[in-house]
């Protein structure tokens, strides 16, 4: 599941890996408030500030930004004169500006990435993520080859029930692998 931090980093076009960002978010003691999110953005060397917008004037803000909406936080992706597009818990939502202003508390976190804004040890984390992906694909390929060879050698698909039972067992192995 994408976290608020990884969603915001994606919208800011910051080089990051989901595994590091999600782990940082999960382990941060203040992950559900603006202080915590600000602290996490500082790890990525992103200048940021929490602000209170008087009269909820959205024109004062440049997207993307994090907004406090209905006791939760959302990442506002873009705004127009008619609508506000934001991401809330991995759901992309578009609402009229007036409706958004009713939901919004006027509190926002704005960020200004610089040239040095990136994940600490990004290359190392990216390489680790790539190795993990290759390992998963390799295991799946080996299982498929073994399945094909085994079914050919032992005629596993000669009956419908044999094939069905094999499919159920493989589905169980797949679920436990995830």
Regions found by a protein language model. Give the residues of each.
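Membrane-interfacial helix-loop segments of redox and metal-homeostasis proteins
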Residues: 139-178
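Noncatalytic regulatory segments and standalone regulatory/sensor domains
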Residues: 1-12, 17-18, 22-32, 59-154
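Contiguous, structured surface segment used for ligand recognition
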Residues: 1-2, 30-60
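Residues within well-ordered alpha helices
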Residues: 7-8, 40, 167
């Amino acid at each position: 599941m994408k976290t608020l931090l990884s969603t915001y980093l994606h919208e800011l076009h910051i080089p990051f890996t989901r595994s590091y960002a999600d782990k940082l978010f999960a382990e941060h003691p203040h992950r559900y408030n603006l202080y915590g999110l600000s602290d996490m953005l500082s790890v990525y060397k992103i200048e940021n500030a929490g602000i209170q917008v008087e009269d909820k004037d959205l024109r004062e803000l440049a997207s993307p930004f994090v907004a406090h909406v209905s006791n939760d936080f959302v990442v506002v992706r873009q705004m127009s004169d008619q609508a506000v597009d934001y991401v809330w818990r991995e759901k992309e939502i578009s609402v009229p500006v007036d409706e958004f202003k009713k939901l919004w508390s006027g509190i926002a976190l704005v960020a200004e990435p610089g040239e040095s804004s990136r994940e600490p040890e990004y290359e190392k984390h990216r390489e680790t993520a790539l190795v993990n992906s290759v390992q998963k694909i390799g295991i799946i390929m080996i299982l498929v080859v073994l399945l094909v060879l085994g079914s050919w050698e032992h005629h596993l698909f000669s009956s419908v029930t044999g094939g069905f039972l094999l499919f159920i067992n493989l589905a169980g192995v797949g679920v436990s692998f995830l």
